[in-house]
Amino acid sequence: MANKQVEISMAEWDVMNIIWGKKSVSANEIVVEIQKYKEVSDKTIRTLITRLYKKEIIKRYKSENIYFYSSNIKEDDIKMKTAKTFLNKLYGGDMKSLVLNFAKNEELNNKEIEELRDILNDISKK
């Protein structure tokens, strides 16, 4: 799984966030959680679960005739891979362009600007 290119759709992120939050969860629990904030059918959610399983992003086990799902990949790992894919696709891998684009187009307050400076200073010390 570590070297495999993994991409998750926006809808699949909803499923993954529930799985990461609960560690082990049934399909019914996932459906209930997503339907609390999104109008989407049971079948659609179950299709997303199946896709994630086929991509080997989640694993499942059966207990008393119910499948339970858990993550097969660390949340931080998939977020980093997704961020790198985004950076490469939209900015040709140029981190400076990404940061400048967000900094110019978002209204950063003084605290956020100072935090960014601190982060950059910490990185430059390494």
Curated annotation (Swiss-Prot):
A single GO cellular-component term on record: cytoplasm
GO BP of this protein: negative regulation of DNA-templated transcription; regulation of gene expression; response to antibiotic
Transmembrane segments: none
Single GO MF descriptor: DNA binding
Keyword Cytoplasm: yes
Location in the cell: Cytoplasm
One Pfam family it belongs to: Penicillinase_R
SUPFAM superfamilies the record matches: Winged helix' DNA-binding domain (SSF46785)
Keyword Nucleus assigned: no
Region feature Important for dimerization, mapped onto this chain: 74-126
Residue ranges the record marks as coiled coil: none
Entry PTM: Upon exposure to beta-lactams, the protease BlaR1 is activated and cleaves BlaI at a single site. This proteolytic cleavage impairs dimerization and abolishes repressor activity.
Top-rank taxon, per record: Bacteria
Keyword line: Antibiotic resistance, Cytoplasm, DNA-binding, Plasmid, Repressor, Transcription, Transcription regulation, Transposable element
Site entry (Cleavage), positions: N101, F102
DNA-binding region extent: 7-71
Major location (coarse): cytoplasm
Role according to the record: Transcriptional repressor that constitutively blocks expression of beta-lactamase. Binds DNA as a dimer.
Subunit structure as annotated in this protein's UniProt entry: Homodimer.
Family, similarity comment: Belongs to the BlaI transcriptional regulatory family.
Listed name of the protein: Penicillinase repressor
Source organism of this protein record: Staphylococcus aureus
